[in-house]
């Protein structure tokens, strides 16, 4: 479950996280935050993963990887419009646990639009990734098709199209997707 710690976001979170089942991983979402800020949030909210949604460099990710506990995962986001040079990912391979591919838009996420997933055919890494960007119920057939490929898709990241309002998910829609995925396995 993602908690957005970027103050310019309509989904900005600065409250107390309610008690969650241990099976739900708490992910802090950051945009060009300092190492100090990320460390503070990891401690304050007992985060299990950090999602970097800004212009964080390989060096930044490498430093973060060295100073956070080993069990905390790093997810580096890359925004895609029509094309993408997957070669730039090579330098991030050893300093990130996952990649996340989102649609390039005005905001760093939550734009509600999809990118052309055909570009992922050029993904040659074995590094698992999250598929994101404007995924709603209307896209679930296409999601199910791409999940049948050999791509190392780790998870589907849903956001704006599953919200009642920014930061508040429609639980019924989330259940529908989870049940749909469960019965298709």
Where are these regions (language model features)?
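Short intrinsically disordered, low-complexity coil segments enriched in acidic
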Residues: 1-3, 16
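A generic "structured core" feature
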Residues: 73-75, 130, 137, 141, ...
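Conserved anion-binding
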Residues: 5-12, 21-132, 136-139
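Residues within well-ordered alpha-helical secondary structure of globular protein domains
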Residues: 44, 126, 146, 180-183
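Hydrophobic residues within beta-strands of alpha/beta enzymes
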Residues: 1, 50, 99, 150-151, ...
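Alpha-helix termini
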Residues: 15, 68-69, 129, 146-151, 184-185
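C-terminal helical cap(s) of enzyme catalytic domains, especially alpha/beta-barrels
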Residues: 16-20, 63-64, 144, 159-185
């Amino acid at each position: 479950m993602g908690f957005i710690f970027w103050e310019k976001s309509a989904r900005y979170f600065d409250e107390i996280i309610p008690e969650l089942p241990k099976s739900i991983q708490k992910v802090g979402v950051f945009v060009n935050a300092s190492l100090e800020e990320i460390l503070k949030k990891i401690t304050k909210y007992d985060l299990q993963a950090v999602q970097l949604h800004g212009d964080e460099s390989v060096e930044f990710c490498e430093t973060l990887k060295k100073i956070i506990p080993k069990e905390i995962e790093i997810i580096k986001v890359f925004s895609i419009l029509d094309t993408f040079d997957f070669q730039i990912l090579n330098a991030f391979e050893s300093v990130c646990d996952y990649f996340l591919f989102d649609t390039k838009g005005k905001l760093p996420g939550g734009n509600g639009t999809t990118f052309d997933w055909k570009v992922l055919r050029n993904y040659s890494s074995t590094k698992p990734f999250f598929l994101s960007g404007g995924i709603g119920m209307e896209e679930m057939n296409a999601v199910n098709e791409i999940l049948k490929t050999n791509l190392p898709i780790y998870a589907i990241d849903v956001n704006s199209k599953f919200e009642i309002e920014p930061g508040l998910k429609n639980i019924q829609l989330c259940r529908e997707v989870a049940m749909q995925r469960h019965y298709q396995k």
